[in-house]
Regions:
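Cytosolic regulatory regions of ion transport systems
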Residues: 1-172
Length: 172
């Protein structure tokens, strides 16, 4: 019983303990532990794989929005940074990441573009717990995932396979 209570809010205990520890020089920290900086981004795209990359490109090129990507894959981040994209290294399923992320009030949209539904669910929970109150969009592979996302406050939930089918038909 006690462990169930502790596990449910364990991150709060960790935060309280961490607040009492001395500050660390960021250069000495593991890159995943450093503060991310979204700068003046209006949109944060979480997961910079194929779907996230496409969303990032469309949001910047077509809609002229300021976007920051988030990913945990170091080589992918380096490749995207070399292409001129702003990508933050971090684990979006970790509440610590969201609490450490430097973001201005300009961030008003979060796009959950990770391939696993469970990761998007956890990232959504962390995003909400960190105080984010903007719009959330999410990709999903299955209709039940789209339904779950909508039931949990995701304003735009999109089935990637349905979208691919529509685009394919438009190209024929």
């Amino acid at each position: 019983v006690v462990s169930a209570l502790v596990n449910r809010r364990g991150h709060l205990m960790v935060e309280k303990i961490a607040a009492r520890l001395p500050a660390q020089d960021e250069l000495n920290l593991n890159p995943e532990e450093r503060h991310g900086d979204a700068g003046d981004a209006e949109v944060v795209v979480i997961g910079m794989g194929r779907a996230g990359f496409a969303a990032y490109q469309r949001l910047t090129d077509h809609y002229r929005l300021r976007v920051a990507g988030v990913d945990s894959d170091g080589p992918r981040i380096q490749r995207l940074a070399a292409e001129g994209l702003r990508v933050i290294e971090g684990d979006a399923t970790d509440l610590y990441f969201w609490n450490q992320l430097r973001r201005s009030d300009s961030v008003r949209i979060a796009v959950l573009a990770m391939p696993r539904h469970g990761a998007n669910v956890t990232a959504l929970e962390c995003l909400r717990e960190s105080g984010f109150s903007g719009k959330v969009a999410a990709v999903a592979r299955y209709d039940d995932e789209v339904q779950w996302a909508r039931e949990h406050g995701v304003g735009i939930a999109f089935n990637v396979y349905a979208g691919a089918g529509l685009e394919l038909a438009d190209q024929v």
